Amino acid sequence: MIDWAESESGKGDKVEPKEENEAEESKDGEGTQSESGQKKESSKEAEDADVDRRVHTTVGSGSGAKGFRERANENVDRGDGKVCGGVGDVDAGVGTTGTNGGRWVVLTEEIARAIESKYGTKIDVYRDEVPAQIIEVERSLQKELGISREGVAEQTERLRDLRRKEKSETHARVAEKGRRKQGKRVHGDAQKESTEDEKTPEEPTSVGITIEGVMSQKKLLSMIGGVERKMAPIGARESAVMLVSNSIKDVVRATAYFTAPTGDPHWKEVAREASKKKNILAYTSTGGDVKTEFLHLIDHL
C-alpha cells in the first residue's frame, strides 16, 4: 500500500509541470489556446483530487478509513448470494427434524419389553391416544424379538380394532356430509349450497393414526434409536444346583422349582407335586428373557 501511494503521489508530481506550462502559455497571451488550456487545467485538477482522495482512503486513519483487505471482504459478501453477511451463520435455520414431531409406539407390553431388553430403548405402548404413530411388528421381526404366540395374537387384535374404528368413523363422516347436502336441497337453496361447499374445507379422511409395518431390525432401529445389545453368555459361576429337570420323578430330591412358559403340557402336575414338599422354594418368571432369569436364579441358589 505504501508503494502504491508513492507511485500515485509520483504521478501527481508529474502532473504539476504540465499545469505550470499551461499557466506560462496563458501568460504569453496566446488567445486561441487559452480556453483549451483552462479546460485541460480543470480536468487535471479533478484527476489530482481523485488521486488525493484514493491516497487518503488507503493510508488514512480513523473509523472512516478501511484497508484493501476489509474492502475486498465486503465486496465478496455483497456478491455472494449464499452469504448474507461477514459474520453471519451460514447454517442458520438448518436443523434436525423428527417424524412429524411425534414418537413411535407399539401395541403390546410384551413387544415394548422385548425392544427394551434387546436394544436398550424404552418405547411406550399405545393407549388409544390420537394422533399416534404405531409400529406394527411383522413376522420376521417377531421371531428376532422372541415374541410369543400370545403377544402376536394381541397385536393382531388391536390392529383389527383400530382399523374397524377408522372405518366406522369414515362412514360416519360420509353419512353426516350426505345429510347436510340433503337438508340444503330440501330448502331449495342450490346457489347457496354451491357457495358454501366451496367455502367449507374438506374433512380429514383418517383419525390421525399412522400404522407402519416393520420387518427388519435396521428399520426398527432407525425409527426408535438405540443399538443391538451384544449379550455375553450367562453361565453359573458356582452353584449347589446339580440337576435341572422337568420330570415328576425328580420332585423327591428337589429343593426349589421355577415356573416359566416352556411349552411343557405336564408342568402343572410337576408343580402340584413339588408344592407338597415343605422344604421346597418356589420361583416364577413374570416377564423378560426366561433363560437369563433362570440362569440368574441358579447363580443365586
UniProtKB/Swiss-Prot annotation:
Coiled coil: none annotated. Its main location: virion. One of its GO terms (cellular component) is viral inner capsid. ATP binds at K82. Residues 1-99, 163-208 are annotated as: Disordered. It catalyses: ATP + H2O = ADP + phosphate + H(+). It is found in: Virion. Keywords: ATP-binding, Capsid protein, Hydrolase, Inner capsid protein, Nucleotide-binding, Virion. Transmembrane segments: none annotated. One of its GO terms (molecular function) is structural molecule activity. Its EC number is 3.6.4.13. InterPro entries: Orbi_VP6. The keyword ATP-binding applies. Pfam families: Orbi_VP6. It is an enzyme of class 3 (hydrolase). The keyword Membrane does not apply. Residues 8-30, 37-55, 67-81, 163-177, 186-202 have a biased composition (Basic and acidic residues). ATP dependent RNA helicase essential for RNA packaging and viral transcription. Possesses ss- and dsRNA-binding capacity. Homohexamer. Belongs to the orbivirus VP6 family. This is Helicase VP6-A. It comes from Bluetongue virus 2 (isolate USA) (BTV 2).
